[in-house]
Amino acid sequence: MQSQVRLPSNGNPALSFPQNEIGGPVHWKTYLEGCSPCSFPSLRTVCPSQSWPASVSITIGDSIFRRLEHFSDKTGISVATVFRASWGLVLRIYTGQDSVCFGDMTTAPGGIDAIGCVGVCRVELSDTAVISKVLQRIQAASANKLAIPHVPLSDAVLSKCMPSASLFNTCMLISGGGERPEKTSSTFEKVELGYDDQYDIIVRGSVEDSGASAALSYRTSFLSEEQATSIANTFERAVSDLIGIENRIGQICFLSDLDKSQIYTWNKDPPLRAHSCVDTLIHERCLSQPTASAVNAWDGELSYEELNHLSSKLSRHLVTLGVGAEVFVPLCFEKSRWTTVAMLAVIKAGGAFVLLDPSHPAERLLSICQKVSARLIVASAQHAKLAEDLVTSIVEVGDDKADWLTDKGIKAQTQTRTRRSAAPGDALYAVFTSGSTGTPKGVIIEHGSFHAAVFPYTEAVGLNQESRVFQFSSYAFDVTIFDTLMTLISGGCVCVPSNTERWSDVANAIQRFRVTHSSLTPTVARILDPKDVLTLRTLVLGGEKLVTSDITKWVDQVRLVHLYGASECPIMSIQSMTGVASDFQTTDHATGSNCWIVDPNNHDRLVPIGTIGELVIEGTIVGRGYLDDPEKSSATFIRPPGWLCQVRGSGYHSAVYKSGDLVQYTADGSLRYIGRKDTQVKLRGQRVELGEVEHHVKLTFPNATDVVVELVVTIHASSSRAPILVAFVLISHEADPDPESIRTGRGEGLSQILSEPTDRFCSQIPIVQSQLQQSLPSYMVPGIFLPLMTLPLTSTDKINRKLLRELAGALSREELESYQPSTGPVRAPQTTTEKLLQQYFARVLNIPVEQVGADDHFFQRGGDSLTAMKLVAMARKDKHKLTVQDIFDSPRLSALACVVRSGKVDGNKEPPLEPFSLVNKHRDIIRAAAQQCQLPVRVIEDVYPCTPLQRGLISETLRDSKAFIAHLAVSLPPDIDLQRLQEAWTTVANANPILRTRMVLSASHGLLQVVVREDIRWIVSKNAEAQDFFVGVGKPLVQLVLCCHREGNEVPVQLLLMVHHAVYDGYTLPLIFEQVKAAYNGGTLAPRPAVPFIRYVQSIPDGTGYWNSLMANLQTPIFPALPSKSYQPLPNAIMRHTIITPGSHRQYTPSTYVRLAWAITQAYHQGTCDIFFGTVVSGRNAPVTDIELMTIPTVATIPCRVTLDFQSLVQSALRKIQDDAISGIPFEQLGLPHIRRLGEHAMLACSFQTLLSIQPALPPSTDAWFEQPGSTIDYRANATYAINLFFGLEGDKLKATALYDFNVVKKDKMQSMLVDFGNILQTMHKSPNSLIRDILAVPQQMRGPINSASL
């Protein structure tokens, strides 16, 4: 038998050889277990029009060869092993992976006629790995492969071992005697296997008695000759260092002499030092062009002479108030000409200014003022009240606030105070950015640093005396500072629009002010049309990632400039975009500084050209550091590393800034931006750039030659017609359809656009989606993947995206499901009750009725406790008795039909409660409530106790005003009737007391809920982000904002719902939105009182017996352990992980699976089988009539204990956890403070530091109004423990988000736990009848106690 083998790069047939060794496939399966794909990245910025094979020599000189021979004789490590390890090291630094693999082709020892064997070489590397151990492992693995020389890594074997068909794109060919220390002569040139077109890079090596030779073969479309030479030199350096260093991998320097020389040439000139101060440069302009316009604002104009006069007067006044060097002065202004006066006045006084955005929360502004130790603040009259709350001493500046223009207010004794002339090393300004802990982080920029950026910036942007610069950016961003000071230094005019113009009339403002230059984010630039801003000559884009359309839209209309910088180092690089072909991910050489690329884990090592590393900036342009944060400053603003001192001299002391950006040098020394170090790059808002999704899908989907992603509305969508992201994946076929029929979209060619679904394609979809979750936000991961035979084209030979949208939109549900794994036949329901339940199942699970069978398992088909409640509600409406526990006990449709009971259910309803009947002394309480709410007594509708959940949430907010407040943005259709919408919300608020609820404090009852008769609060604004919402005692907990920011239109385009978590949970919002829709369409609403649930909570027994029994003899330490008993966890790191969970065998709720999987994970990492943690429950299983319709939050936090028997079945453990959960339903609402008081063991259980929150998948909205593209889940607002785990269900995916305190749990530990959790969860689904012991290898320290406990 002959087996044809295809190499993994492009699938062309290569070799035929016998495959008769049984052990071969087993060997490869074992060897490749856990292996990740390793792809060498293309270093080309622009691919040439033609491609051909090429090669460069790798110099293995006589001295290195003699060292290799000596090393081999001494250690027994072959030359081939050293070559393999060296190439593994090269792959590591170019891919950033510690685990790498590549093709391994070795000519058998029989000579030139021997058959080549294609395999894989895996190399596990890390900085701490011992070199000798690495070499020994590689050699041992190679020996095992040589034992089965005729069994290659065929596609069949590879497909069994790896989910991805593209495992590697580089290969090494070893010929001659390099495989063993003893020599076997063979000639490199005689080995002609013809593999050049199979891999992007091939490294060929040959060893003879006389010496060794090597070469690197490549495709010119993949590498340039210079890049290939650099890689070859890096390989040579790796070979030399591997046999010369006896310690660890981290000690190897991969930078070749050639690369070092080139990098030093690019950065040979030290950045020039700046010797002037900003006020001096602006003063020169004021003297040389006094009548020229300096500021043209909506509230007035100032010439340079007027600006100089006003700022000088104000500066003298500030000096008398103590402003001088290193004194920071906050400025609090709306957009105004007076802001520029105040900025320049502080500079002239010798101080440093701090611009505040008054729209930001007062707490943040106060924090900034406290950080800078502000003694006084300069503010406009409009924001004087706010300023007084920030700093006690205020100087008002404005048209009617100019007492400082005369010297009358200056005390005689301070008249003699004069400021010291500023020095280049003095602080010029501080700009605050978000800190990792939520506290604003201040960056100090000195005069010298700013001056160093002046000439490079003004030259690149083209600023001069004719320039009119648009000051668009918020005062919170340093772009405003550049737009102001750079313009004044250049003699131009600063154009200041009003806030209204900024948000709703940008184009007209640009025209009205005759703006020539503007700095905008790409997002803002996208809303402008070049035809509407004809005065604009230069557009500077920065702050966000560019896409191709940003260039094509503007490059032929204006001078387009791409600015790359950071607050810590204002300008890193500036690139002029000269054409559509410009690489917008690449920036030009450094501007006013030098750019170096270092090892991300060690800034004392430079990396070779083309490898990915961290960008560090050298030069005066670098800021001073972070205000009052020496630790962070020393980690980011570092002393010159040794390699820099070698270039500049030992006494060199220039500042060096570690940017945290991952970049690589291109062949000409420019920089290509890759991403952020150790973080994921975020998109601004939730805009989906289809090109970005296409890029990632193409990288991820095996053998995809092209990808098109479109937003499609399918014909089977519910009434909401919600669109879904569809990825069209081009797959290769022998014959393409007729291009003309496909171009026009007519004829038989249309049916040939989509390929038939195959098992291989369908099985890859969940794997690809899981991989995409690692690089894209969840909303950017396509939900549907369709294979294409060819790309349809328009008459102009462009991709016919419209045709693809129509094609996907026309597919039926059955056709779409054919691209998913097939399911078995359905047994139709027989009895009347079974048919009724079939209807219920279909409605709550959103699946066609005909696809629901009598044997269907409710939880297997996607049900959970939330959908179970909806099913119960449907049964009640049809006068059938059914409980959630019935569904848990009998989840199969046929079995559930046997327990459904007919009869009236409404008779069991408790009588309605009278207002105020749940509190004593209600008259006194009503008066106190009215006083705290600052409302008349007559509007107090009811008062009743808070739930334990509400008490806890409000208490946290009283300590931190931002805690547990959600901002949910809802897009509105253009034809919305505003009056009807507001009336609808009023109707909903009248029907739902929870929306009219406030919280008050009572001496006798503690925290109480007060329902008031009032309309819901509305605000109309131009800026959703500018709205503050403060929650406190007696304050409303709900506020609605209509945001009108559509260009040229005052119609609101977005509704912002600001709401406290004490009045909603994840279940209530869809209910409220459904009511709004019904009211908008003229429907009537039934009241949704919260009192029945409050009465139930008040009547719950204390639970002493239940909780003490559940937690009896609990002695397990808290996990994770805190540094000290008094330590307060502060979640400050986030990590995400997506797990594909098969639907089969899911006989229990997702919550049950999650609890057990986490219990096993925690047991593994804690070393005990008695586990406890916290969990959030929905509370909707409570026996309260119509609880599924109530809009009061019912979630609760409870402790959960799991005692693992590692000899028991997974099924048994799942059943035990689910039974415990059901039996605990009556005691869920007691609250942690109450449970904690029940006893010593209960107190320990409530001291958990790990909290699990499982959110079931909610059904899609029923109306397009209520899509929420602007809303985000703020996990930080709800996290107070050392480990907070949030789980979201989306089909067969479980999305885990861990928010944790990295001072308690290190990043690698958290990552390890999430990976273990995912593996355990998947195994539980796949093998529910396996032993818990078999799910995960039990640590050695656990085996003793676990065995004894189990036996």
Swiss-Prot record:
Sequence segments annotated as region (Adenylation (A) domain): 285-684
Superkingdom: Eukaryota
Region named Condensation (C) domain: 941-1340
Expression induction: Strongly expressed in planta but not expressed in axenic culture.
Keywords, comma-separated and alphabetical: Ligase, Phosphopantetheine, Phosphoprotein, Transferase
Positions of the Carrier domain: 828-904
GO cellular component, one term: cytoplasm
Pathways involved: Alkaloid biosynthesis; ergot alkaloid biosynthesis
Modified residues annotated as O-(pantetheine 4'-phosphoryl)serine in this record: S865
EC number assigned by the record: 2.3.1.-
Transferase listed as a keyword: yes
GO molecular function terms noted in the UniProt entry: ligase activity; phosphopantetheine binding; transferase activity
Keyword Nucleus attributed: no
GO biological process: amino acid activation for nonribosomal peptide biosynthetic process; indole alkaloid biosynthetic process
Domain-level remarks: NRP synthetases are composed of discrete domains (adenylation (A), thiolation (T) or peptidyl carrier protein (PCP) and condensation (C) domains) which when grouped together are referred to as a single module. Each module is responsible for the recognition (via the A domain) and incorporation of a single amino acid into the growing peptide product. Thus, an NRP synthetase is generally composed of one or more modules and can terminate in a thioesterase domain (TE) or reductase domain (R) that releases the newly synthesized peptide from the enzyme.
Function: D-lysergyl-peptide-synthetase subunit 2; part of the gene cluster that mediates the biosynthesis of fungal ergot alkaloid ergovaline, the predominant ergopeptine product in E.festucae var. lolii. DmaW catalyzes the first step of ergot alkaloid biosynthesis by condensing dimethylallyl diphosphate (DMAP) and tryptophan to form 4-dimethylallyl-L-tryptophan. The second step is catalyzed by the methyltransferase easF that methylates 4-dimethylallyl-L-tryptophan in the presence of S-adenosyl-L-methionine, resulting in the formation of 4-dimethylallyl-L-abrine.
Protein family according to the UniProt entry: Belongs to the NRP synthetase family.
Name assigned to this protein: D-lysergyl-peptide-synthetase subunit 2
Originating organism: Epichloe festucae var. lolii
Annotated gene: lpsB
